[in-house]
Amino acid sequence: MRISIAAIGKSGQSPEHDLVHRYFNRLPHKGALIERDSSKTSGLAGKRDEGKRLLAALPAQCKLVVLDENGVNLSSVKWAEQISSWRDAGIRDAVFAIGGADGHSEDVFAAADKTLAFGVQTWPHMLVRAMLAEQLYRAEMILARHPYHHA
């Protein structure tokens, strides 16, 4: 199963960008890092525009996991179990989506198969990308029974 990260906003050259790529490039079944520009329009119209562009960039019939502060909190082991169950079910693509500054549009939430959170705190978007890439790599290492998870 290919695993991709889709995000609103360009990462540019930054320490966070380097960290995202460090972990993402270690994934054995990586898909794509999909970035879409933030909308030039603010408010609800901007959020809808971002959502439309994000959804248009996704692979057909992918499992869409939306990151949102109101999502479910899962342990690293539970993330790994979820990824494993999708692989076992023959899912070809899973995409983890990070919204723009105003969050995800209703269309993105409606298309989501799962909504996850990184705790109750609010995190900078670029840091969330790095945290997500690391957790996806950690999930792969858990499934491979590699000592990384307990190192």
Residue ranges and their predicted role:
Residues S11, E69-V72, G100-G103:
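Short glycine-rich anion-binding loops that position phosphate/pyrophosphate groups of nucleotides
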Residues P28, Q61-C62, A112-D113:
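Short, well-ordered alpha-helix to beta-strand connector turns
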Residues N25-R26, W86-A89, M141:
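Arginine/glycine-rich "motif VI" loop of SF2 helicases in the C-terminal RecA-like domain
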Residues G31-V95:
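S-adenosyl-L-methionine/SAH cofactor-binding core of RNA-modifying enzymes
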Residues E106-H150:
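Structured adenosyl-cofactor binding patch, chiefly the S-adenosyl-L-methionine
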Residues H17-D18, K47-R48, S76-A80, F109, ...:
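Conserved strand-to-helix beginnings and helix N-cap segments that scaffold or border functional pockets
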Residues M1-L27:
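N-terminal beta1-alpha1 ligand-phosphate binding loop
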Residues I5, V65, G99, L132:
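Conserved RecA-like P-loop NTPase ATPase core
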